[in-house]
Design a protein with these regions (language model features):
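N-terminal strand-loop element at the rim of the active site
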Residues: 7-66, 153-155, 163-166, 238-240
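Nucleotide-sugar donor phosphate/pyrophosphate-binding loop at the beta->alpha transition
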Residues: 13-20, 65-72, 107-108, 117-139
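A short helix/loop element that forms part of the nucleotide-sugar donor recognition site in Leloir-type
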Residues: 73, 177-195, 200, 247-250
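A conserved mid-protein helix/loop that constitutes part of the nucleotide-sugar donor-binding site
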Residues: 16-21, 199, 203-222
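Donor nucleotide-sugar binding/catalytic pocket of nucleotide-sugar-dependent glycosyltransferases
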Residues: 54-55, 134-186
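Short His-centered aromatic/hydrophobic patch
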Residues: 88-94
Length: 293
């Protein structure tokens, strides 16, 4: 009988994008259960990775009552499944999963810090986020910062005195470098988006405040006034409820003739290949996949 491991994130998109291939590999040695909030991506994970999945509603923002309900559901799940390992990523799933796993006395409790929220906040919210990260660390048995910057902030803010295990130089999963080769097919698709001799800046990621989108758009609008032969390509979706951009930024994205909003794209290779420069003004990152891509 294989030992059981539960991998958990707040939203299914994290499992779908960040752990591609990893769950399938784990399933060769372990019985794997992937847990997150419900969504189409959770079904994709089950099919692609060949693992069981379970949907438990979790909120990314602070929601005390819903968080308590999610914690209780996780406790019930862990007692039913009796895993040997619970491994979480993303802040809210980390807090709830590590608490539930400790209550249920799961032997191995791992949390991967994929990026820290509190360094980009201030006041009472920062103190609350620091307290929740400290609680996550206290409940875990192993802590894995995604990158050197994350490890540095955990140490600088005295979040934990426990050992921090950085795998290699960081990153959560690595990427298939061959997949991002500039193959003839990728370059053929890139020609659809290329606008010679226009100079193209490209951003890939969530279009939210934390990713520096307000500053990026503002800087580009000013730049484009002086150098008209340039454009900005934005590949990703908004998160209006969780971390909205300013109304002025949103208006520029939708109406500025030199800003191309491409929305969510399953395959980002043609957009990267069509660009002259990649821009990534994020406030907080671990070791982001998109840089490797």
């Amino acid at each position: 009988m294989k030992p059981k491991v539960i991998r958990i994130s707040t939203v299914p998109l994290s499992l779908h994008l960040l752990l591609q291939g990893q769950l399938k590999m784990l399933a060769e040695t372990y019985e794997v259960l992937a847990v997150s909030s419900s969504g189409e991506e959770l079904h994709k994970v089950a099919e692609r990775e060949g693992v069981r999945t379970c949907a438990i509603p979790m909120e990314r923002h602070i929601a005390p009552l819903k968080d308590l309900i999610a914690l209780i559901r996780l406790i019930i799940l862990f007692r039913k499944e009796k895993p040997q390992i619970v491994h979480s990523l993303t802040p809210k799933a980390g807090l709830l999963a590590m608490m539930a796993a400790r209550i249920c006395r799961v032997p191995i409790r791992i949390h991967t810090f994929t990026g820290l929220v509190f360094p980009s906040t201030t006041g009472w919210k920062q103190q609350l986020l620091i307290a929740t990260d400290k609680l996550t660390c206290a409940c875990a048995t192993y802590l894995n910062p995604e990158g050197k910057g994350v490890r540095r902030d955990l140490e600088r803010f005295h979040i934990t005195s426990r050992a921090l295990h950085l795998i290699g130089n960081g990153n959560i999963n690595g990427i298939d470098l061959a997949y991002f080769d500039r193959t003839p097919e990728v370059m053929r698709q890139a020609e659809i988006y290329r606008r010679n001799p226009c100079f193209t800046f490209c951003f890939v990621g969530r279009l939210v405040r934390d990713k520096g989108i307000n500053e990026l758009v503002s800087a580009f609008v000013r730049l484009q006034q002086e150098f008209t032969n340039c454009r900005l390509c934005l590949v990703g979706d908004f998160e209006a409820e969780l971390d909205p951009v300013t109304p002025e930024t949103a208006e520029h994205i939708h109406k500025h003739p030199a800003i191309k909003f491409m929305g969510w794209q399953e395959d980002i290779r043609p957009f990267l290949a069509a660009a002259d420069a990649f821009v990534f003004p994020s406030y907080r990152e671990g070791f982001p996949n998109v840089i490797l891509q």
